[in-house]
Amino acid sequence: MGLLSLAIWTPIFFGVVLLALGRDDQARMVRWLALIGSLVSLLVTLPLYSRFDTSSSAMQFVEKTPWIERFNVWYHLGVDGIAFWFILLTAFITVVVVISAWEVITERVNQYMGAFLILSGLMIGVFCALDGILFYTFFEATLIPMYLIIGIWGGPNKIYAAFKFFLYTLLGSLLMLVALIYLYTKAGGSFEILTWHKLPLSMSAQTLLFFAFLAAFAVKVPMWPVHTWLPDVHVEAPTGGSAVLAAIMLKLGAYGFLRFSLPIAPDAAHEYAWLMIGLSIIAVIYVGLVAMVQQDMKKLVAYSSVAHMGFVTLGFFIFSDIGVSGGLVQMIAHGFVSAAMFLCIGVLYDRVHSRQIASYGGVVNTMPNFAAFAILFAMANCGLPATAGFVGEWMVILGAVKANFWLGLAAATALIFGAAYTLWMVKRVYLGPIANDDVRALTDINAREFLMLSLLAIAVLYMGLYPKPFTDVMNASVADLLKHVSASKL
């Protein structure tokens, strides 16, 4: 087995073993097995980093075996600088989520942990797949564990949220399947994504393909106006579900743009860049304003996710190396920061069982250690320099200003809104006098919660202070992608 196959199938194997274990009286063993499984899965991805050649833009660690020979479908994996960090991010966040669920999930523990490990493997599969059908299989299969996680361990409205999540994302993907089959016939019966990149296509074909992929990926990102499923799902999902959804699942859509929309339909991408930039700016400004009036902490962070992902799509469609790299860095940073924000809300929810901002106030007085973490992550969420949240946003704004000054100005206003809604939440939840008896009775974080938050805090600070390892890996691949996209296929 190659390294990428190990990265995909190790967590899935542990997940299936956990599902087979069954009863809740084995919960303690199940938790330890889940932790061991997630740690092994993370360790399996580490050799990728030491062996990755940052100077090359080619696919690395390639594996290719026939899968469905009749239709020329291959089990074809490979990773370049664009996909590389998301494999490590997925494995890392899975470890944190297993730790976060330790004492919190008490019913059907084996199914909960199993679902997360299987989901982790499937998401890594999306980032490695180089065959259209393989990509589609992994992309759609991620819906199933997430649907169960929301529908079984979610809040009071969980069934509605799970259905909404499933239908929205599934309907978008159906158009993508049509696009994949069209490309298959065009390419003489090949599902190779890299072959599709070289296909000469007419403008009308590119336009249809571009919008078919847009339907699938915009829902996943989610871009405005198809973002309405996200706040509902985040509010109902359990803490771990929210963390994985925000940190990794949203990235599958943005990754799809770079792997499909831009290289397969470059002329259409340039033609409709104004549309994508417009939708991104709306997401960044309008959704930022919507976040300011939220009373529910999870909804606030959910809307802030839409605004942050607006930066990502903006960076991609200004077609400059600093913009695309900035978008990728923002995706990784948002993975750390959004997971941390949701886990912090989970820490409070486990104690008070309320997500309403009005239920809190003066938490810093009773939980000083926790408040220090929470405020650090909040600062990263508004893009404070020296935190992960700053680097990507700054790169995208720099790229936007180079492309068009007014565009850069519009993007920069988002930082003001980001600071406004985040700091307002911090002020009302953490600062000031103790608001009520619930807050007075709070106990500070235990060792498990401290470990989970400190892992993320280290990641957020390291990435903010020294982003070079992150950008070095992607530079060659981003340059190659832009060279490809700048050449017309007509």
Q: What is the meaning of each model-derived region?
A:
Residues M1-T10, V79-T90, G132-P145, Q206-V219, ...:
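Structural signature of hydrophobic alpha-helical transmembrane segments
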